[in-house]
């Protein structure tokens, strides 16, 4: 059974239900939050039954997915309480178009087994990335405060070091900056990723510091799941604390608007982990997962 959730009331019920399963449901929760608040990426939510669902998948509407090779748009967020049910649900072509290049995102690492099983059935290759999931202490206090009982907040100051404000000016990104962001984004560097970045800049808040020449020296933005992503710093401005200043600014903007604030960092990126620690962004017991799927 596939139930599309239509209208604000059903989505608000889903959001409320997903809160009970945070932080494991975070990728889906963040996406549903932004569907309720404008839905600029034209997404839809599907569940196996309603209201007592086992599995929820958020994905674009079919008319958005016109390019079979564009896995930036062909992206699915998944949360499931039941791995067996999840596999049956994801197998359906009405839920996931397995003929396309696509990506699946989830805060549940145990879905890896389910997706590997599907790979052998549907005949596609997988590239799995598992990174550290960070959530701001303010978001934790608001959405799942019980987690703070097990965390020590006494270390990070919560504020970045001051920057030279005569040299650098806090600003936001413009669509013309998409090419620069794309060049330095680990998952980007191509035409499709640039279109995706342009769409994110147009629809969501972003932060940057402009260097003396008036172009971005460091930046961060957010995607359709509400995650802070695609951050970067020009090589000549690295090691000056600019990225922590920009992330702190973006955090404040998102918190003021009531958005959940979260991000991910590679396990090998010690500098970003230290920055997260300083800004009181806490590592979660669950991970950030992405499965890039390519038909064979």
Swiss-Prot record:
It catalyses: an acyl-CoA + glycine = an N-acylglycine + CoA + H(+); benzoyl-CoA + glycine = N-benzoylglycine + CoA + H(+). Belongs to the glycine N-acyltransferase family. This is Glycine N-acyltransferase. The modification N6-acetyllysine is found at residues 16, 113, 127, 141-142, 159, 167, 183, 256. Mitochondrial acyltransferase which transfers an acyl group to the N-terminus of glycine and glutamine, although much less efficiently. Can conjugate a multitude of substrates to form a variety of N-acylglycines, thereby detoxify xenobiotics, such as benzoic acid or salicylic acid, and endogenous organic acids, such as isovaleric acid. GO terms for molecular function: glycine N-acyltransferase activity; glycine N-benzoyltransferase activity. Its EC number is 2.3.1.13, 2.3.1.71. The keyword Acyltransferase applies. It comes from Mus musculus (Mouse). It holds the Pfam family Gly_acyl_tr_N. The keyword Acetylation applies. One of its GO terms (biological process) is monocarboxylic acid metabolic process. The modification N6-succinyllysine is found at residues 16, 127, 141-142, 169, 183, 256, 267.
């Amino acid at each position: 059974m596939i139930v599309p959730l239509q209208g604000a009331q059903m989505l608000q019920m889903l959001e409320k239900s997903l809160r009970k399963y945070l932080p494991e449901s975070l990728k889906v929760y963040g996406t549903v939050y932004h569907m309720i608040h404008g839905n600029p990426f034209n997404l839809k939510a599907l569940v196996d039954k309603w209201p007592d669902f086992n599995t929820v998948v958020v994905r674009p509407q079919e008319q958005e997915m016109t390019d079979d090779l564009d896995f930036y748009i062909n992206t699915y967020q998944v949360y499931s309480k039941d791995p067996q049910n999840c596999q049956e649900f994801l197998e359906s072509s009405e839920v996931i178009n397995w003929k396309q290049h696509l990506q699946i995102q989830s805060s549940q690492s145990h879905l890896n087994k389910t997706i590997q099983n599907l790979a052998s059935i549907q005949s596609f290759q997988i590239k799995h990335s598992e990174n550290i999931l960070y959530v701001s202490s303010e978001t934790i206090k608001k959405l799942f405060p019980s987690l703070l009982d097990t965390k020590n907040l006494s270390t990070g100051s919560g504020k970045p070091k001051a920057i030279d404000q005569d040299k650098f000016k806090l600003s936001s990104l413009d669509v013309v900056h998409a090419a620069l962001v794309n060049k330095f984004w680990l998952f980007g560097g191509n035409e499709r990723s640039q279109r995706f970045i342009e769409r994110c800049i147009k629809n969501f808040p972003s932060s940057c510091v402009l260097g003396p020449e008036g172009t971005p020296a460091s930046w961060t933005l957010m995607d359709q799941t509400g995650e802070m992503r695609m951050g970067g710093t020009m090589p000549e401005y690295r090691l000056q604390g600019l990225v922590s200043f920009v992330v702190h600014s973006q955090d404040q903007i998102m918190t003021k608007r009531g958005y959940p604030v979260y991000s991910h960092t590679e396990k090998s990126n010690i500098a970003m982990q230290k920055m997260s620690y300083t800004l009181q962004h806490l590592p979660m017991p669950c991970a950030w997962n992405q499965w890039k799927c390519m038909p064979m």
